Design a protein with these regions (language model features):
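Acidic, glycine-rich flexible loop segments
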Residues: 29-294, 304-306, 318-322, 331-339, ...
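Gram-negative outer-membrane beta-barrel transporters
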Residues: 459, 584-726, 733-741
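Solvent-exposed loop/turn elements at secondary-structure boundaries
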Residues: 333-334, 464-481, 485-631, 687, ...
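Extracytoplasmic gating/loop element in the C-terminal half of outer-membrane beta-barrel translocons
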Residues: 699-700, 718-720, 729-827, 833, ...
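Hydrophobic, lipid-facing positions within transmembrane beta-strands of outer-membrane proteins
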Residues: 74, 119, 132, 160-166, ...
Length: 880
C-alpha cells in the first residue's frame, strides 16, 4: 500500500481546470479574503476521493509550487517507473514533517509523517450539480521570460509550454448529474545540462586491435562534437542543450444518479497519457517513455437509516509503462565510472509493463449516541505482466584500474566488468491483497473526543501464470494495525491538546519480487570481470542456462510488508484572537524496511592473486556469482518538532508559516526503497558481516531544518465601487510561497574496486578512509566549495573504509514562488481570472551533490543544479 501513499500524480485529480494553478488563493467572490494555506500548486492535481487507488503514475514536468517547490532540472534523469518520481522528489526536497490530527480507520498512513499522502477507500463521494457550470483554462510559459540556469553557457534556447482544458457539468434530469473534464499539455523546448565528455585529445581509441578500435570509436562517437566549455569546473564538462517533447492528455467523465432519498450510484472513468520524446545531451542517454493510465469506478450508496450509510464500490485500474532505448548502432549500455556521462540508455531498458488492479470495497458509517462507527474492507487482485531487462543488451563498466584512469581504459578497450542477461524474462504475476477495518469516534464529554481503530490486512505471495517462477515467501496474513487518538479542549480557553498513535503497513512492491525472473533455469545474469571487449561472454555456454554460473536473486521465506509505528502530540491555541498556533511533535519507528544484501563476495584466498580478474574464483559459493538476498533488513527512525502559525485574515493579509526540526535515520534503506535496481545499489554495505553498524546513518531524505511560508494579500480597493480605479486596481491578489530547507545528505564512494584503491571483493561501493576528520559532516553547497581529495585514503584488499554513510550534505533550498491574480465577476457564478506566476522568483540555484567517487577527476566538485532557473507563466481561467 506504500505505492498508494507515494503517488506523485494521479489521473483522477480534481477538475482539469485546477491542474496547473499557481501559488495564489482563488477568491470565490469579489470581497473574499485570500487564504494563505489554500495556495494551489503548479503541477500535479491533488488526489481526490477516487485517487485511493493502487496504480501509481509517474509524470515529468510537474511541480508542487504551492508547497514552495521549484521546477526540477530535467537533466537529473530517472526512469518513469515504480515510485521513482516520488523518490526523486524526496531526495531533492527532503521530508516534510506532518502531524496527522486523526487516524481514520479506513485510511493507511504509512510514511504520512514524512509528507506522503495517506491512501483510503476507493469509493466515490456523492455529489449534485445544478445548471450548466464549469470552466475553461489556458496557461502559457515561454523561454523568452525564463532565466538561465546557473551553469548555462549562452542564452536560453527557445521553449514553450501550453496547458489548456475545460470542465463542464450539469444536472440532466431528476437525480442525474453528468460532468466531463479534459486537458492537454504540450511542452516543446530544450533541456540545458552539463555532461562530461572526452577532451579533444581523448576522441580516438588507444587500442591497437582494429576490431576493438571500431567498437571503441562507436562509443566515443556518442558524445557531441562540441568540446568542453566549462573547463573552469571540470576539464571534461560541456554545458549544452537538447530538444525534448512532452505530450500530456487527460480525460475524466462522471455520471451520478440518485433514486429518492436513499439510493445513489456514481460512475467515473479517467484516462491519462504522457508521451516523452526524451532529450539526448549525448546520444543514447535517455529512453523514450510512454505512460498510460485507465481508471474506472462504480459506487453504490444507500442511506440505511437516518444514522447509517452504506457504500459498495468496484474499481479497475490499469497503468502501462513503455520505456524504449534510442535507436543506435551501439546497443550496449556503457558506464565510465563518473568520469564521463554514461550512455546506452542504462542496463534496465527496455521495459514494457502493464499493471491491472481490480478492487472491491464496502464501507459502513453509523452513529449510535455519541459514537460514530466506521467499518468495512477492501480486496485487491493484482496482475503485473511484461518484459523488463536486466543487462539483456549487455553493459560495460570502465573504472579506474590497471594503472589507468577510467577514460584511458575506455579508449584502450579495457573494461573492468561486463554484465549480460540471457534468457526469457517475460512474466505475468498475480497476487491478492486485502484489508478490513473498524473504528469508533466517541465523544464522552463535550470537551473530549476519542478515536480508536483496528485494521487487519493480508498480502499473498505472487504466482506466475506460466509457472516459470516460484516465489518462496509465505502469505503475510497477520498485519494487525491498531490506532488510537484523542482531542481534549483545555479549560479556560487554553486551546486543544491532540495526540495519536497508529501502526501502519506498507507493501511488498511488484518490482521487489519480480527480480526472481532473472534466475536460472530460464535466465542467467552474468558478471564477467576484465572481459574481452569484442567477445565478453565467449567462454560461457549459454545453451543450458540452468548450468550457467550467474547472479542469484533470492527472497527470504520470512519476507513481510514493512510497517511503521507513528505517534504524535500537539497543542493548538490562539495567542491572539483569530490567530492559531500549533506546537507539536511527531515520530515514528519503522521496522522491517525492504533491503537487498549482496552476499557471496570475493574473499582474500591464500594462493589466489587478489585482482579483479580472480574475483569469481574467490567467491565462497562456486556455483553462483553475486547472491542478492531480498529481506526485511532495515529500520527507520524519525523524530520531528513542528510549529505552525495561521493568520487567516488580517487587513487583507493571510499567512501560514511552518517550521520543523527533524532527524531521519535508517539502517541502510528507507521507507521508499524497493530493494531492486538502483535502490539495491544505494544500500550496499562494505562487507557481508556487521551490515547494520556499517550502514546506520542519516537517511538520504533527511533535511533537519525547514521553513515554509505562505502569504496571500488582497490589494485594497482604491476608489468607489464601479469607478475606473476600482475596476483597474480592485480584486488583485498577490501571493508568495517560500521554502527554505537544509540540503539532503550524500554519500562518498571509492569509485573503483581495483587493488590499491578498493577492497577487490567484486562489488563497488566501498567508502574511503577518512584522513582529515575536520571535513566530516561538511555541507558542499556551492561550486566554490570543493571537497578535498586529500582528506580521504584508499583501502587495502579485503578492507573497509571508516567514513560513515551519507556523511556530507548538499546545499540548501532557498526558493520563492510568487503570483499576481485579478478576478473579474461577470454576473452570477461567471468570472474571468487572469494570473501571472513566477517559479523561483529570485533565480536561486539549488545545487546537486558534487562528484562522489574518489577515483574520478570530478570528485568533490559540483557540476549540476537540481532546479531550473526563474520562469514566468501567464494564464486565463473563465468560469461559468
Amino acid at each position: 500500500m506504500l505505492a498508494c501513499s507515494l503517488l506523485l500524480f494521479a489521473a483522477l485529480g480534481p477538475s482539469a481546470g485546477t491542474k496547473d494553478t499557481p501559488p495564489t488563493a482563488t477568491a470565490t467572490a469579489a470581497e473574499t479574503q485570500p487564504e494563505a494555506d489554500a495556495a494551489p500548486s503548479e503541477a500535479s492535481p491533488e488526489p481526490s476521493e477516487a485517487d485511493a487507488s493502487d496504480g501509481e503514475v509517474n509524470l515529468l514536468g510537474r511541480a508542487k509550487t504551492g508547497s514552495g517547490e521549484g521546477r526540477r532540472n530535467e537533466n537529473v534523469q530517472f526512469n518513469l517507473i515504480d515510485n521513482n518520481a516520488a523518490k526523486e522528489a524526496a531526495i531533492r526536497l527532503g521530508t516534510s514533517a506532518t502531524l496527522v490530527s486523526e487516524f481514520a480507520p479506513e485510511r493507511n498512513y504509512f510514511s504520512s509523517e514524512l509528507g506522503a499522502a495517506p491512501n483510503g477507500p476507493v469509493a466515490l463521494r456523492a455529489r449534485t450539480l445544478g445548471d450548466w457550470h464549469g470552466n475553461v483554462f489556458w496557461r502559457h510559459l515561454n523561454s523568452a521570460t525564463s532565466a538561465r540556469s546557473f551553469f548555462q553557457v549562452g542564452g536560453v534556447k527557445p521553449a514553450r509550454e501550453n496547458d489548456y482544458g475545460f470542465r463542464v457539468g450539469r444536472a440532466l434530469w431528476r437525480g442525474a448529474n453528468f460532468s466531463v473534464d479534459a486537458s492537454q499539455r504540450r511542452i516543446r523546448g530544450n533541456v540545458n545540462g552539463n555532461v562530461l565528455v572526452p577532451r579533444p585529445d581523448e576522441r580516438t581509441p588507444l587500442t591497437d586491435d582494429p576490431a576493438e578500435r571500431v567498437l571503441v570509436q562507436q562509443m566515443l562517437d556518442v558524445f557531441p562534437t562540441e568540446t568542453p566549455n566549462r573547463t573552469d569546473i571540470n576539464e571534461r564538462m560541456l554545458n549544452t542543450n537538447a530538444a525534448q517533447g512532452i505530450d500530456d492528455d487527460s480525460f475524466t467523465a462522471r455520471f451520478d444518479q440518485a433514486w429518492g432519498d436513499k439510493n445513489r450510484v456514481a460512475m467515473q472513468y479517467s484516462y491519462l497519457q504522457q508521451l516523452v520524446d526524451a532529450f539526448q545531451l549525448i546520444r543514447t542517454q535517455n529512453p523514450d517513455t510512454t505512460t498510460r493510465s485507465h481508471r474506472a469506478r462504480i459506487t453504490y450508496g444507500r442511506t440505511l437509516s437516518p444514522t447509517s450509510e452504506l457504500q459498495l464500490t468496484t474499481a479497475f485500474d490499469r497503468a502501462a509503462s513503455l520505456l524504449t532505448p534510442e535507436e543506435s548502432e551501439l546497443e550496449t549500455a556503457v558506464f565510465v565510472s563518473t568520469a564521463l556521462t554514461s550512455f546506452g540508455n542504462g542496463s534496465t531498458i527496455p521495459i514494457d509493463r502493464a499493471r491491472n488492479v481490480f478492487r472491491h470495497g464496502a464501507l459502513v458509517r453509523k452513529t449510535v449516541g455519541r459514537h460514530e462507527l466506521t467499518y468495512g474492507g477492501e480486496v485487491f487482485r493484482r496482475q503485473v505482466s511484461g518484459f523488463e531487462a536486466d543487462a539483456h543488451r549487455g553493459a560495460y563498466s570502465f573504472n579506474r584500474a590497471f594503472g589507468n584512469d577510467a577514460v584511458t581504459n575506455l579508449r584502450s578497450g579495457t573494461a573492468s566488468t561486463y554484465f549480460l542477461g540471457v534468457g526469457n524474462v517475460h512474466r505475468g504475476y498475480r497476487n491478492w491483497e486485502g484489508e478490513t477495518f473498524v473504528g469508533d469516534r466517541w465523544s464522552p464529554t463535550p470537551g473530549l473526543d476519542l478515536n480508536i481503530g483496528l485494521r487487519w490486512g493480508f498480502l499473498t505471495p505472487p504466482t506466475e501464470v506460466d509457472e516459470l517462477d516460484g516465489v518462496a515467501y509465505d502469505c503475510d496474513c497477520n498485519n494487525f494495525a491498531p490506532t488510537f487518538g484523542f482531542a481534549y479542549r483545555l479549560p479556560h480557553g487554553a486551546g486543544r491538546l491532540r495526540g495519536g498513535f497508529g501502526l501502519h503497513y506498507g507493501t511488498i512492491f511488484d518490482v521487489t519480487y519480480m527480480q526472481i525472473r532473472y534466475n536460472s533455469p530460464n535466465n542467467a545474469k552474468l558478471v564477467i570481470p576484465t572481459p574481452d571487449l569484442l567477445a565478453p561472454a565467449s567462454d560461457i555456454d549459454v545453451s543450458d542456462l540452468g548450468s550457467v554460473r550467474g547472479v542469484r536473486y533470492e527472497i527470504t521465506p520470512e519476507l513481510a510488508a514493512p510497517y511503521s509505528m507513528q505517534y504524535n502530540l500537539s497543542w493548538e491555541f490562539e495567542p491572539v484572537s483569530n490567530w492559531l498556533l500549533s506546537l507539536g511533535y511527531v515520530g515514528s519507528r519503522s521496522p522491517k524496511l525492504l533491503a537487498q544484501w549482496h552476499l557471496n563476495r570475493a574473499r582474500i584466498v591464500e594462493g589466489i592473486p587478489t585482482t579483479l580478474r580472480t574475483v569469481n574464483e574467490r567467491r565462497p559459493d562456486p556455483t553462483i556469482l553475486d547472491r542478492r538476498l531480498v529481506l526485511n533488513g532495515s529500520r527507520g527512525y524519525f523524530d520531528a518538532a513542528k510549529m505552525d502559525l495561521t493568520i487567516p485574515h488580517w487587513k487583507g493579509l493571510s499567512v501560514r508559516a511552518s517550521y520543523w526540526f527533524s532527524k531521519l535515520m535508517d539502517l541502510g534503506t528507507d521507507y521508499a526503497n524497493t530493494a531492486s535496481n538502483e535502490d539495491s545499489w544505494r544500500a550496499r554495505s562494505q562487507r557481508v558481516t556487521d551490515i547494520h553498524p556499517d550502514m546506520k546513518a542519516l537517511s538520504r531524505f533527511d533535511s533537519p531544518h525547514a521553513t515554509l511560508l505562505r502569504v496571500a494579500y488582497a490589494l485594497p480597493r482604491t476608489g468607489p465601487r464601479g469607478s475606473w480605479r476600482a475596476a483597474a486596481f480592485g480584486n488583485w491578489t498577490l501571493s508568495m510561497v517560500s521554502l527554505m530547507k537544509t540540503g539532503t545528505p550524500f554519500n562518498i564512494e571509492m569509485g573503483s574496486d581495483a587493488p590499491g584503491l578498493g577492497n577487490v571483493d567484486g562489488l563497488p561501493g566501498e567508502r574511503p578512509m577518512l584522513l582529515d576528520p575536520s571535513v566530516h559532516g561538511a555541507t558542499i553547497g556551492h561550486p566554490d566549495t570543493v571537497l578535498p581529495r586529500e582528506a580521504f585514503g584508499f583501502l587495502e584488499p579485503g578492507g573497509a573504509g571508516d567514513l560513515g554513510r551519507n556523511a556530507f550534505r548538499k546545499g540548501p533550498i532557498r526558493n520563492v514562488n510568487a503570483s499576481l491574480a485579478r478576478r473579474w465577476s461577470l454576473g452570477g457564478e461567471a468570472a474571468l481570472t487572469l494570473r501571472a506566476e513566477s517559479v523561483n522568483f529570485f533565480n536561486t540555484p539549488q545545487f546537486a551533490a558534487p562528484g562522489t567517487r574518489l577515483t574520478d577527476q570530478n570528485f568533490g566538485v559540483i557540476t549540476n543544479t537540481l532546479n531550473e532557473g526563474r520562469t514566468f507563466r501567464v494564464g486565463l481561467d473563465a468560469a461559468f
